[in-house]
């Protein structure tokens, strides 16, 4: 299934249209929610507010990673300059990512998805797995083992956040430290500088769990992982609002549509899915309702 076989040229043009206003709103909303959550922890320190942040911040961290991903595709803003600068300095570096190496590795994922050459296969090809194996992965994520492993990999230059691609830049860690210095300074100006540790603790624990769930939701236990048809090798999760807020921000749950037309901005993906349904292109494609169903599918019976 190819875009020009299903959609008219006018429909494709409309879907591919980028909006700087929508892009900036997504970026600003993410950071406003981040600062608001950290302010709440500082204003009312306690177990409940810390737990609230531990649950809410991973979605904001993933939101930044998704926006980096969009910028890497050149589909977030209208201009390459904005995609490169905002994608790197405002979205990637705060989450210890690197736009350039990520985009390089992600291009290969799109090119080879549905084949043995997909570089991201190790993230999901083993599923379904036993319940005990899944719980072991969760323990590593939630106790910080996965996050600390990522930090070691970043320091050695062997990978970047959300990608196995070598970043190859001796300045990347320095840039990440610089951006986090600015982040700490901004928090300190509000009198809540110590909440940076809440951000980092969340990043190293619950965020790792959310990233794993995203990977499983997108490609694990699909109809046919080795078929080039995106309807078979990739999944969209039709999730309720609360799950999208906590686990799948910025329409990242519309992953099948993203693979179908990678240039469509994330804010246009729901419209793309609606059009595909109207045209019957998704007839017979299994509907996955929520990430609870994803987790059930990920466990071997």
Listing of model-derived features with the role each one plays in the protein:
Residues 67-86, 117-124:
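Aspartate-rich (DDxxD/NDxxD/DxxxD) Mg2+/diphosphate-binding motifs
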Residues 64-73, 102-114, 214-221, 248-264:
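Histidine-centered catalytic micro-motifs
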Residues 232-251:
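Cytosolic juxtamembrane regulatory segments of multi-pass membrane proteins
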Residues 58-68, 100, 146-151, 199-228:
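Transmembrane alpha-helical segments that form the membrane-embedded catalytic/substrate-channel core
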Residues 84, 88-89, 226-237:
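Membrane-cytosol interface motif
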């Amino acid at each position: 299934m190819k875009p020009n076989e299903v959609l008219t040229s006018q429909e494709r043009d409309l879907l591919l249209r980028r909006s700087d206003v929508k892009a900036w709103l997504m970026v600003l909303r993410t950071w406003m929610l981040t600062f608001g959550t950290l302010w709440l922890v500082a204003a009312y320190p306690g177990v409940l507010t810390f737990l609230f942040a531990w649950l809410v911040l991973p979605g904001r961290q993933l939101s930044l990673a998704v926006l980096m991903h969009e910028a890497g595709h050149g589909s977030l803003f209208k201009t390459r300059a904005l995609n490169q600068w905002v994608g790197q300095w405002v979205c990637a570096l705060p989450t210890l990512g690197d736009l350039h190496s990520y985009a390089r590795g992600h291009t290969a994922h799109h090119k080879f998805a549905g084949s043995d050459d997909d570089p991201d296969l190790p993230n999901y090809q083993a599923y379904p797995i036993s319940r005990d194996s899944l719980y072991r992965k969760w323990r590593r994520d939630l106790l910080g083992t996965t996050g600390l492993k990522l930090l070691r990999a970043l320091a050695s230059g062997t990978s970047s956040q959300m990608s196995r691609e070598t970043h190859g830049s001796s300045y990347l860690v320095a840039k990440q430290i610089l951006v986090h210095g600015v982040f700490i300074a901004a928090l300190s100006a509000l009198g809540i500088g110590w909440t940076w540790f809440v951000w980092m603790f969340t990043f190293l624990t619950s965020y790792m769990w959310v990233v794993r769930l995203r990977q499983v939701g997108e490609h694990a236990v699909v109809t046919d992982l080795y078929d080039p048809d995106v309807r078979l090798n990739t999944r969209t999760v039709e999730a309720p609002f609360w799950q999208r807020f906590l686990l799948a921000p910025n329409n990242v749950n519309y992953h099948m549509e993203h693979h179908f037309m990678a240039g469509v901005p994330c804010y246009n993906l729901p419209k793309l899915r609606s059009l595909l349904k109207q045209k019957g292109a998704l007839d017979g494609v299994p509907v996955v309702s929520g990430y609870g169903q994803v987790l059930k599918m990920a466990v071997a019976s």
